[in-house]
């Protein structure tokens, strides 16, 4: 969070797997309850309905403005960011993003969606919040994650933002983003998750918890028997192979350019990929894009005076 003229600038990176702010990460799962849930932890109370947030992930949808749950997830994300600073009431300027090639067509609808209520009262984890939305800045996903290190982007560079639902690809030549050379592929980490779960079911006839697969993808291992681990590892290696094949489709050549990877897919490349570490930079900070949104919005609003 940043502050400018008594307005709190709060960035929210609306991922299919996680909602990120500059200082918080929350899985996108959401379940409604008519009465207060028995167990505590990330409970949102809005318009008389209780929502448990953070169990599992949401399924891919191409237009988030068509899904009311992303509005609720946004309220939770804002509350969690404000809670870091012990703030309960604020004038809020939102900073968010959309996939590279979708932002042109979806920008205004998504802005209207996020600003649908100028003033909101709700409870998050038993704490009252009162928000007044005063504006919203929207940016292309991925690029903001590296905006503070553009000085490193000499020559030809390829940026791959590999999220849970999509992979955004952008060329950056001599510190300048090439708008005519950007693509969005529906090839996110969730594709690997689905393939891994199916492989375990096909090979062993059992279902595996998604949280177990996620631990393997993030850290390269988990407390399971070697046969299951080998099965999932093989799927993950193939997924990373397919990532590089997709990048080559867009003329990626490691000898001629540097590759920068942001998003959750970076840990899969690190854990299961074969690549030249001197030519590939993996940005581990899962909140990097949200921090970039925040910085860009702050600079833009400051210039306006």
Task: Describe each PLM feature range.
Residues 1-159, 176-191, 203, 211-305:
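Nucleotide/phosphate-binding catalytic cleft detector across ATP-hydrolyzing
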Residues 21, 169-171:
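Conserved blade-register residue in beta-propeller folds
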Residues 162-168:
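Ser/Thr-glycine-rich phosphate-binding loops at phosphate-binding pockets of nucleotides
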């Amino acid at each position: 969070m940043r502050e400018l003229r008594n307005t709190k600038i709060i960035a929210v990176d609306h991922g299919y797997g996680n909602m990120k702010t500059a200082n918080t990460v929350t899985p996108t799962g959401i379940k409604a309850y008519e009465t207060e849930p028995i167990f505590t932890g990330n409970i949102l109370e809005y318009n008389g309905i209780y929502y448990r947030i953070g169990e599992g992930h949401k399924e891919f949808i191409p237009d988030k403005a068509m899904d009311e749950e992303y509005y609720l997830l946004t309220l939770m994300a804002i509350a969690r960011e404000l809670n870091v600073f012990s703030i309960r009431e604020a004038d809020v300027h939102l900073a968010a993003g959309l996939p590279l090639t979708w932002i042109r067509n979806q920008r205004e609808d998504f802005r209207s969606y996020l600003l649908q209520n100028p003033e909101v009262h709700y409870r998050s984890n038993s704490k009252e919040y009162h928000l007044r939305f005063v504006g919203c800045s929207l940016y292309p996903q991925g690029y903001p994650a590296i905006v503070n290190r553009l000085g490193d982007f000499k020559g030809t560079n390829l940026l791959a933002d590999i999220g849970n639902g999509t992979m955004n690809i952008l060329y950056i030549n001599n510190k300048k983003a090439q708008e005519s050379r950007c693509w969005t592929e529906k090839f996110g980490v969730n594709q690997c998750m689905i393939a891994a779960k199916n492989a375990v079911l096909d090979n062993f006839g059992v279902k595996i918890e998604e949280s177990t697969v996620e631990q393997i993808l993030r850290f390269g291992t988990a407390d399971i028997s070697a046969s299951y681990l080998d099965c999932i590892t093989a799927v993950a290696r193939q997924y990373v192979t397919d990532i590089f094949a997709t990048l080559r489709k867009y003329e990626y050549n490691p000898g001629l350019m540097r590759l920068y990877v942001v998003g959750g897919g970076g840990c899969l490349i690190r854990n299961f990929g074969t690549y030249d570490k001197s030519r590939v930079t993996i940005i581990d900070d899962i909140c990097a894009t949200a921090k970039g949104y925040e910085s860009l919005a702050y600079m833009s609003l400051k210039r306006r005076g």
